[in-house]
């Protein structure tokens, strides 16, 4: 068992656990900031799908967005917050613990 309460499955963050949101935070863990278009292309999702998942992460306080202009072109940058980076680290720790507890088949 974990020092935290309960089974490791109970420690998984439902906001982070969804595949696209986990991917967003994983990409952001490797960079200080990421352009919306790059993130969309890396994750293989539509603009609308990515926007929706970013909204969920933003509501949880896990990401922030910053809009800039390059010439006349708008550009949206996504940044993981300290809380978002901590949520990803905690989620990955819970996954590791779950895998260790279940073992290999």
What are the residue ranges of the model-derived segments?
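Short, hydrophobic-biased segments on the C-terminal half of alpha helices
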Residues: 54-55
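Glycine-centered, phosphate/nucleic-acid-interacting loop/turn motifs that mediate DNA/RNA or nucleotide
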Residues: 61
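Short beta-strand "wing" residues that participate in macromolecule-binding interfaces
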Residues: 65
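Amphipathic alpha-helical dimerization/coiled-coil segments
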Residues: 1-9, 26, 82-105
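N-terminal helix-turn-helix DNA-binding core of bacterial DNA-binding proteins
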Residues: 8-49, 68-79
